[in-house]
Amino acid sequence: IDRLTSPLPNIQAEVKAGRLGVFWHTQGSGKSYSMVFLTEKILRKVSQNYSFVLVTDRTELDDQISKTYADCGKSSRLSDQVVSGQQLKQKLSAGNQPYIFTMVHKYNQWVKEPYSRRDNIIVISDEAHRSQYGDLANNMRAALPNAKFLGFTGTPLMNSPEDQATKDWFGDYVSIYNFQRAIA
């Protein structure tokens, strides 16, 4: 939240470029709940007009995150979980729906026209260290040119080309809850 509201010029530039940062929370630490708490806090403290597109790269993760939101009473798995690329485009074009759950593979079509030009969309990519680059990710960013992107990962690739790519796409780490902290 601090990055969204920061008056600092360097942080404002990162946010304007769509890079909100990366949450590195170790596996099993409750990243899905962290997403719920974060998105609800943004809606409560910053603006109720944000939409969140929660992107995963596996069906199991998509089901897990949408179920977590539904179990917390924040969404409906039936209406908020996208089943096709066409449905994704329709939901994003339609307006302000708080939560949309999708897989990066739904962005498999070349984007001729953006799905939405809104600047109050935050894309939250789970497992941001993998499958959030290349054609699918480029299509996603073309579909949502004014969106802001936030990455979550439990397995950062420290000091590797992939780690640098994650930072290039999402920005620097904004929260670290590593294994050492988890067991302390």
Give the predicted meaning of each segment.
Residues I1-A184:
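RecA-like P-loop NTPase motor core of helicase/translocase proteins
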